[in-house]
Design a protein with these regions (language model features):
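Compositionally biased non-globular segments, especially hydrophobic aliphatic-rich helices
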Residues: 18-21, 147
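Transmembrane helix-loop-helix hairpins at the membrane interface
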Residues: 59-69, 84-187
Length: 187
């Protein structure tokens, strides 16, 4: 064969040339990482083994029983646990609410030094966010119901502050909603 180029050039992958793809992808800018961290969108330490988190999980059934005083008990049949209505109430609403309230609102409030002041683990940012969270529920619920919602809201904010992440708050909120709506969501 002569030194002429081949009339059928080989694809780069077949010529032995290599290049690393990761070197062409720039790392995320530090400001983006800071924004995500401020919103609580970062991986938390092992919250599922934390005694405070486990206590809040254990208190869930007591919260459900307290809240069922405002509703008749109508447990859902097992097949209804896959219904769009149940998935919305137990999964999608807690996800949206936690990203909005504990991620954006509480995350933004925590940027202020004064809002980081805490009493028994409850920051001022958590307290104000929980009040806002409860007041939003007043649009469709009674004052008594909003007060009952305020207590779990403080718990969700507490774990957001404790772990610096919204993921534990989302997990706890999903658990609370799933338990509650499985008790009262049936007809």
């Amino acid at each position: 064969m002569t030194g002429k180029p081949s009339p059928w050039p080989l694809h780069r992958e077949h010529t032995g040339e290599t290049r690393t793809i990761s070197s062409t992808v720039p790392p995320p800018p530090s400001y983006l990482i800071q924004i995500l961290a401020a919103l609580g969108l970062q991986s938390p330490r092992s919250f599922h083994r934390d005694p405070a988190f486990l206590l809040l999980v254990a208190l869930g059934p007591m919260v459900w029983l307290a809240m069922t005083g405002f509703s008749a008990l109508h447990p859902l049949p097992w097949q209804a646990l896959r219904s769009p209505a149940f998935l919305s109430a137990a999964l999608w609403q807690p996800l949206f609410e936690e990203l909005l309230f504990r991620g954006i609102v509480q995350g933004y409030a925590l940027q202020s030094r004064g809002m980081q002041k805490a009493w028994n683990g409850i920051t001022l940012a958590n307290l104000l966010t929980s009040l806002l969270f409860s007041s939003v529920h007043l649009t469709s619920h009674s004052i008594g119901w909003a007060f009952l919602i305020f207590v779990p809201a403080l718990c969700f904010g507490f774990v957001r502050d404790r772990f610096g992440s919204v993921y534990p708050a989302i997990a706890l909120h999903v658990f609370y909603n799933a338990g509650y709506f499985s008790l009262v969501g049936g007809t």
